[in-house]
């Protein structure tokens, strides 16, 4: 049984300090925030991939933006986390024994603000010296997650937000 547990453990890669940022660009304002509190697990046997991050983990350059983001838009007291559960659909084409850059397609469910959507995301896995780095850039429509922007600032915030992901995975926690 111990041998089985060790074998299963070795197939999972983890990060507790992954990076996710978002960007909203309009002609009136550029809004950016970063979150380094991203937890993720990659199962190298199946290609299953999970992410979880605290909404309050996003940091803004302006504290007032951070306050509005948490209280008015994402309602982080009511919806404290964003999560993704999915699978790398082209996992069988990834060779973990060979350093390189591998394009990946990820399919799964993205949940935030109390809503869940099916998403298809493209990304890259970088394999180097036994480490895996996952990277992706994709967009999210605020309306898909019923995130409402007050009319007063509607022109300041893009309806589509760019999300960037960068996670360095390791065997150990």
Residue ranges and their predicted role:
Residues 10-173:
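Low-complexity, acidic/polar, glycine-enriched regions of mature
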Residues 1-13:
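Bacterial Sec-dependent N-terminal signal peptides
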